[in-house]
Amino acid sequence: INATFLDEISWDIPHQNWGVEEWDRDFRAMRDMGINTVVLIRAGLGRWIAAPFESILATEDVYYPPVDLVEMFLCLADKYDMAFYFGMYDSGKYWHEGDYMKEIDLNIKLIDEVWEKYGHHKSFQGWYLSQEVSRRTKNMTKIYAEVGRHAKEVSGNLPTMVSPYIHGVKTDQVMWGDKATTVSEHEFEWNEILSNLQGVVDILAFQDGQVDYHELYDYLVVNKKLADKYGMKCWTNFESFDRDMPIRFLPIKWEKLLLKMEMARKAGMEGAITFEFSHFMSPNSEYSQ
């Protein structure tokens, strides 16, 4: 595992309420484990934002943040010689309601602001396109393409990363009655999506937790095949929490993680990010083991 997400702002994982000292200790633990890349999973979600972004404060009904988490993470990444990828703002509404241009415009303005304010950090080395999807969604590729293209243009072609999920048996939609996609359906749909993202997305890192363990290898092989076809690096996103438990979410059983790691190695993954170190793998986690 060479990378981890930084789960601020969180979607469904409880916050640990760390300050600079606690995060410094955790970045040191990451480095000691071999992690060299940290990815801010999103700049904001709905009303909550990770820093006082003027472009979002000016137009969106958001809370003013008490601290600048982006500056803190960048300073720590500088200190521990890590690469930092900046994740986009997820409105939580516009793209779900079909107003894709609003989502795009917000993030294009945010990219300009963020690069001007933080681009001097040596650790600022990439972008993460935060909106997560599992299959063809009308105009979803347009968000990835336009936001990703603009991020690369303003930053001198820094790499972009996406981490979609597989529409498998463990997704909420399928557990609520939707039908899981087969491996062949997954390949067909993502071939269409990725054909529109060639040259815009550099790292493809599918989440690995929404399919059953006996199915995972076949999906990994397809993911690698598609990434190779469209000139992308193929990473895997190891979920280090356990979807099989009745509680959302607790650390994964190490045997399960090892099984997934062996499958990823066999399938030829070129890198591995986890969601995520600080809650589910760190010696500093509130989930003590």
Language-model segments: which ranges?
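Feature activates predominantly on carbohydrate-active enzymes
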Residues: I1-W18, D24-R28, D32-N36, G119-H120
